[in-house]
Amino acid sequence: MNARVFILLLLLAARSAAAEHFPVTVESCGVPVTFNQAPQRAVINDINMAEMAFALHLQDRIVGLTGITGWYKLTPDFKAAMGAIPELAPKYPALETLLAAQPDFFFAGWNYGMKIGGDVTPEKLAPFGIKTLVLSESCVQAGGRPQKADMNLLYDDELKLGKIFGKQQEATALVEGWQRRLAALPARPAGQPPLKVFVYDSGEEKPFTSGKYAMPTAIIEAAGGRNVMDGLPASWTTASWE
């Protein structure tokens, strides 16, 4: 058999196998969202969600990023992973900006590219054929059930991405790898209190920091520490220096 024909058959078989997984339904802040096929033109907001997508090697499905350079300085590794993917907006994208990219999928969160009552929300994107996955950590911003942040929020969202893009096995392997790495961390010596950590994001007169519902609290706890602001019943919020 001609080598090119053989490779083509392998590609077609892989595509057919992936198609068998659809339709799939995932929950986005408690709302079921059904995908009849994997997104082909995704837009991803914020560096953390972009890295979640890059971890599944979804670059060939991404037509743009938003909310990157307006908030962050890029590392060489992130620049390499981003490659030629354009940044459509340095901070929050306007509806017109998103529509110009003709996406079929938007991965963002409340206060991570979307604002309650704004022009870019799942409800306002739906009429244009754009399905939205909302970052689970941010659901509390939209009145979702308050839930103290834990690593399962990250794991669940990564598994949802895998399901949406037909990469369930890759997502499962990725999450299991993360879990093994955490489990391998040495335990804190008996009787030793956890290291107290303050998360500083920005602000001078008042610090902008993470509270009980934000992922830094979960990450710090997973590493054996304690966020000193874990009593704040909020996700990201302004606190006082006192």
For the regions a protein language model found, what residue spans apply to each?
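Short helix-initiation/N-cap motifs at beta->coil->alpha
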Residues: 28-30, 85-96, 116, 138, ...
